[in-house]
Amino acid sequence: MNVRPGLTTLAHPDGMRRTLRRALSMLMVCVLPAAANAVPYVFDSGDFLAESSAWEAWADMLTRHATQFDGLKGCLDDKAACTRRMRSLHVVLSQGTALPREKQIRLVNRYVNRKRYNEDRRKIIRNEEGKLTIPSHWATLVEFLEKGGDCEDFTTAKYLMLRHFGFAAEDMRVVVVYDRSQRAHHAVLAVRFDGETIWVLDTDNRIYRKRRPLGYRYVYAVNELGIWDHDIRLPRRRR
């Protein structure tokens, strides 16, 4: 029988699977950001772990987003057809279309960061090993604009809006970081544009161009094309 792979059925060594499960559960513990360390984010293919479809919650969000966004066509064409919460989206997407890449990124970062911050609701399930895992719910752009969300929802909303502006999936990643100063995990968006320019967008309107915030350690990244586990290269004593 053809079974769509889930997080705990990936055909990877046990250590990599444990790292992936840990990274996914980390998304539940998001904090507001800290300040800048000296290593830029690198769009490296060496940490590739799996196709993005292996993470069902992420894949399901992308499917819901496509359906919901298709239903917004009337609103995007005519502001009068928008619901109250979608009017601002119409304005931003309409005005931002003709802007250069740098200004589109700044516009989206500011727009999304004004939205309501809500902690994600936790769901506890058992995997085949009998251990409890805590998956995170991924909100679509429409769901986020209607209800707010936590750090990964802010980051995903930016990702989806920039995709509408024509940014390639391969040039963006939702990145989970560990904030050593807060002793918690957080999500940011890495964006590559104009060749090799890379910016990291945070939830406090900061944009890191060449340096990441002090104490941030990259753990995990995802986009429409795949999942990257940055943590597998780190010596155990540094984790």
Question: Where in this protein do the model-derived segments appear?
Answer:
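A structural boundary/capping signal
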Residues: N2, A36-R239
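Bacterial N-terminal signal peptides that target proteins for export
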Residues: V3-L24
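N-terminal regions of proteins, emphasizing targeting and processing segments when present
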Residues: L7, P33-A35
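Bacterial N-terminal signal peptides
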Residues: A23-P33
